[in-house]
Amino acid sequence: MANPSKIEAVTELKTRLEKRPNFILASYSGLTVEDMSNLRAKLRKEGSEMKVIKNNLFLRALKESSEHKNNSIDFGDVYKGPLAAIFSLDALPAVAKVCKDFAKDKKELEIKTGYMDGEVLGKSGVEAIAGLPSKQELLAQVARGINAPATQIASGINQIMASLARAINAVAEKNGN
């Protein structure tokens, strides 16, 4: 008979994977409790959560998760040593940036791999998406791009109106003298 606490842990991990299917796995050996708390706080700001995992239980939850069971996910030798899973709903680039920036200051945090939209990213993939703009930044860029022509037209019309006003003023002054 399986240990009830392990069954519960697998169920909890499956629930997390189904709610937040994108994730990063990172080694945290050597981080202090304060460091872990700081990292968790930064990750919460991005709408993600970090959980220290038991590797075998995470693998089992991954295989049983409805989001992931149709994918043959192979992370190779990633499952060695203590790992933390950082779960994200859809903002994995922002989460990856938080992890990458944190790892610059705290070398004990080592990004191992990630999983986003059905693809295993690997360490280099996670670091690459960390350089991408966030969803909010992309939306702002699109809005600026859409708004730019209208702004240019309005500016052009204002310049024409100002030139016309100056010309009328000049004619009025000339006729008035």
UniProtKB/Swiss-Prot annotation:
Q: Does the keyword ATP-binding apply?
A: no
UniProt GO molecular function? large ribosomal subunit rRNA binding
Q: Which GO terms describe its cellular component?
A: ribonucleoprotein complex; ribosome
Keyword tags: Ribonucleoprotein, Ribosomal protein, RNA-binding, rRNA-binding
GO terms under biological process: translation
Q: Name one Pfam family in it.
A: Ribosomal_L10
- Keyword flag Ribonucleoprotein: yes
The record's similarity note reads:
Belongs to the universal ribosomal protein uL10 family.
Q: Note the subunit structure.
A: Part of the ribosomal stalk of the 50S ribosomal subunit. The N-terminus interacts with L11 and the large rRNA to form the base of the stalk. The C-terminus forms an elongated spine to which L12 dimers bind in a sequential fashion forming a multimeric L10(L12)X complex.
Described purpose of this protein according to its UniProt entry: Forms part of the ribosomal stalk, playing a central role in the interaction of the ribosome with GTP-bound translation factors.
What this protein is called in its record is Large ribosomal subunit protein uL10
Originating species = Leptospira biflexa serovar Patoc (strain Patoc 1 / ATCC 23582 / Paris)
